Amino acid sequence: MNAVQYIEDAGCLTEDTIIVTHDSVRPFVTYRIIEENIRYAKECGACDTVIPASDTIVESRDGSFISNIPERKMMYQGQTPQSFKAKKLREIYKSLTEEERGILTDACKIYVLKNEPVHLVEGDVSNIKITYPHDLRVAEAILGGSRTC
């Protein structure tokens, strides 16, 4: 919310102000993804970049046994960017309880907790998140295919 506050303090926050949030550990985001995020944030108020889940997703409430296996065709893997009308994002965030704020894992969860719609933007499998050493090797392989020197 600091970014929204900064924009407001600068006198630039309007009903049409769009904020695009992105993980710096996703260096392969494409122009198309960013462009579509801005478009759908303007049209729908909020959007999340996703790719269809290719693996079966299992839910476990206790960490030892499967409690649910959702239909794969309904499952997506979240990526970034995530984009929003800034004023609406701030408004919804302010309405969250401390308990709700404590379970936030990403900005779209703010909307989901308040049953607000979030449009899906098609991501890209190469928009990987570099978190573990293996991810860095994958990123290097992606770069290796596009190096010009």
Which residues make up each language-model segment?
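Hydrophobic helical membrane-anchoring modules
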Residues: 127-149
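Conserved core of the sugar-phosphate nucleotidyltransferase
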Residues: 15, 28-121
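Residue-level signal for inorganic ion chemistry
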Residues: 3, 23, 52, 85, ...
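Short phosphate-binding loop-to-helix
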Residues: 1-15
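Short, well-ordered alpha-helices that flank and scaffold nucleotide-derived cofactor binding pockets
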Residues: 5, 9, 39, 141-145
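Conserved strand-to-helix beginnings and helix N-cap segments that scaffold or border functional pockets
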Residues: 1, 31-32, 133
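Short beta-strand-to-loop acidic/aromatic patch adjacent to the donor-nucleotide binding site
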Residues: 11-25
